Amino acid sequence: MNRVAIVLCDDLGRRISSQYATYETLYADFLRLGSGNDLDIEIFRAHEGNLPGDTSSFDAMIIGGSRAGVYEPHEWIPPLLSMIRTSIDHQVATWGICFGHQAIAAALGAEVAKSSDGWNLAAQTYEFCENASALAADPLRLIAFHQDQVQSVPEGTSCYLTSTGCEVAGLIGDNLMTMQPHPEFTPEVTTAILEASRGSVIPDSDIDDALTRLDGTFSSATASELFWSSVHAAL
């Protein structure tokens, strides 16, 4: 049985959590898609100052999404970045989704900033970079929900995933794998988040467009299998 730390960096809000899902359940369900065995999961809430005390006691750690920017002056972010470096040093398989992707990149010295093209929302197609074509045969179709993006590839990693709207959409290296999109998101949850975002920093026109691009099938199972292949390689 693999022991996994799910490090949350935000909450979905009371209404979405009560009617659809919580981040806890979304990440746990996603991890089980490709695990092939039972998981011993422990939840941590980084945005509330709760981090694993000993990362080496876990086989894997996944760092989730957040409305925060990794460059913003929140007190909880520097300890999170420090923990990421420790986890990688301890050879714990360390994975990041969206904000988690950006946090791992920032912890390793990469720049993270807002995209000049604005928001990247709903279904997107992600191609495997030439150096990573052996990871999967076909592109991934996954849900995006971000404006911040990793601007450079940190030393010791390589970019394995890219899209027209996000050049550095995934990083891979010794004991780490990251992904800018949200493979844990379902169309139903994404619709609820988009509707709840009206009147906020996301233009309503962007939300209307995104809502038309949530049909079809998504590659969440393949993404989970990719994660577990990196975990097993690190064990």
Predicted regions and their residues:
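Short gly/ser/thr-rich secondary-structure transition/capping motifs
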Residues: 40-48, 125, 142, 160-162
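A short acidic, often aromatic-flanked loop/helix-cap motif at beta-alpha or helix-coil junctions
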Residues: 48-52, 120-121, 150-151, 167-168
